[in-house]
Structures are given as C-alpha cells and as structure tokens.
Amino acid sequence: MPKVVVAGSINTDVLTTMRRAPRPGETVSGETVAFGRGGKGLNQAVAAARQGVAVEFIGRVGRDAFGDQALAFFKANGVGTRGIARTDTATGTAIVMVDASAENSIVVIPAANGEVSPADLEAVTIEPGDILVSQFEIPRATIAAFFRRGRAAGGLTVLNAAPALDDAPDSLWADVDILVVNETELGHFAGVEVPGDAAEDAVAAAARRLMRRPGQTVVATLGVRGALAVTADDQVIVPGRKVKAVDTTGAGDCFVGSLAARLAQGDALPQAMRHANVAASIAVTRVGAGDAMPTADEVLALSV
C-alpha cells in the first residue's frame, strides 16, 4: 500500500486562560495553562496515521524538551520520524491566550519550522502512488521541491493552502494535484469574496479559478456544510454532519490527513472526502489539535 509523506510544521501549543488579556505593559494573573501537540503538519500526519496507513514526516524540531515531546508523540502514533532533523533553533511554538469571553489571541513562533530545507527531503524515499502532503507553515521553496520530487517519482501531491499567504509562487500551484482550502483561503487566492453562506455554484466557480493545468482538483471545506470538490468538468458535494462542536482548531487538518490516508488506501475522491468529513466532525467534538484526531474504527462506526 502507498504511504503518506507529510512535509510540514511541528509546534508545541501553550494554551493559557485568564479573565482578560493583558494590555501593553501590563501583567495579569492567569488561571490555567496546558501544553499540547500542534502545527498543521503534525496534525495532518497524526490524522492520517490514525486511519491505519504508513506515514513518514519531514520537518525540524529543536534540541529541547518540546522537540523530545513531539518526537515521542509521533512515535506513539506510528508516524515515522526518519525525516525529522534536530536543530539548535527552538521547536516551533504557539502561545494561545483565551479570556473569559472565549476570545483568543495567538502568537506563533515558527522557529525550527522556518529552517526546513530541500536538503531535508532526501531522508525519505518517495515511491509511485505515495501521497505527498504539505501546508504553508514551512518555506515555500521546500514545498515546491517536495512536490516536484514527488510528482517525478509518481506520487500524488496534496497542498493545504493554509494559512492564506500572498507570496505563493504560481509555479507551485502547477505541481499541486489536489488543493485543499477553506472558504477564507478560497476567497483569498481566487480574489473573490466567498461568504459562509455562498451558494455551491459560487464556491465551485471560485475554486475553478485556482486551477493551473488539466487534471487538478480543488477541494473547498465548508465547515458545517461539508465539502465541495471540483475538477475542470465535474463537481462532488459531501454534506456536513451535525455535531456539538467544542473546539474546531484541528478540523481542517483532520480532513486533510484523513483524505490523504483514504486516497493511499485506494478510495476514489468522493469516498475519501466522505470519510474525511466524518473524521473532521469527530475531531471538533474534542479539545485540542493533534490529540483530537479520531481512529479509523471511530470514523467507520459513524460512516454510512
């Protein structure tokens, strides 16, 4: 069976709660602090591994406690770590401050993630049929090299174009087989407004604006409304599932990782999307990001 190879970010999430966030120059007393595993790359890799496929990761962590914890988390979830290099730069970190009204402020420090280089890609062998996944939390030049190498080896490339950036080179889009975006990212890259209640035809039209060559697929995740995929001449719609969401932090990452896993297992795109949609609907009922990813058995129990 083909494997999933993720080149991406690894973060430690530091979540703090307080009655209100501090003003400039002010110190306030916090209430709780929690540490979790995160980073879009880590989340997507763990989501894929929990669906029962072989997963290899390419990235960087620091020679620090957060790096040790990230490697242990990968190994506990069956993600291969041969492609993860240690560096003197700190492990990527996200500091999240949440006040009593649930409003949050987030500071993301890329740190070691910003040093992932094309040379790091050599640590993992790409084979025909492998699914290559990346996101915009490592250098764009590395993503481009990753996808060129993957397509040359007969792999399928999946780009989660998040977070939405202004410096994505057009040449990168051409090496993407499946592009996954949410409504905000879709509007950003298509140059049109895509409101949360946009009609399916409007979403599909915006998605087709992102295609750069024949054979590409654009998948738009639509939150509670599900997901929509378009090719040059076809369209797939997967309706959402009604659940009581408690934390949507890792929903998109869960969708991407689960989609990649099912494609590696031989599903056609519509079936893979349905599985990924159910997986994401489970993830939002749990607190956290990497820790919230469901197993294949949990997803299959709710699939019809």
Task: Show which residues each predicted segment covers.
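Ribokinase/PfkB-type carbohydrate-kinase core domain
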Residues: 1-10, 72-86, 96-235, 298
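Glycine-rich phosphate/adenosyl-contacting loop at the front of the ribokinase-like
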Residues: 1-60, 65-69, 75-76, 245-246
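Conserved phosphate-binding/catalytic region of the ribokinase-like
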Residues: 1-4, 166, 197-304
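Aromatic/hydrophobic pocket-lining residues that form π-stacking "cages" and hydrophobic walls in ligand
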Residues: 44-45, 70, 145-148, 279
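Short, conserved phosphate/pyrophosphate- and ester-handling motifs at nucleotide-, phospho-/glycolipid
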Residues: 48, 182, 252
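Hydrophobic residues at beta-strand termini and immediately following loops
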Residues: 58, 107, 238
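Short acidic/glycine-enriched loop/turn segments that link adjacent beta-strands
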Residues: 89-92
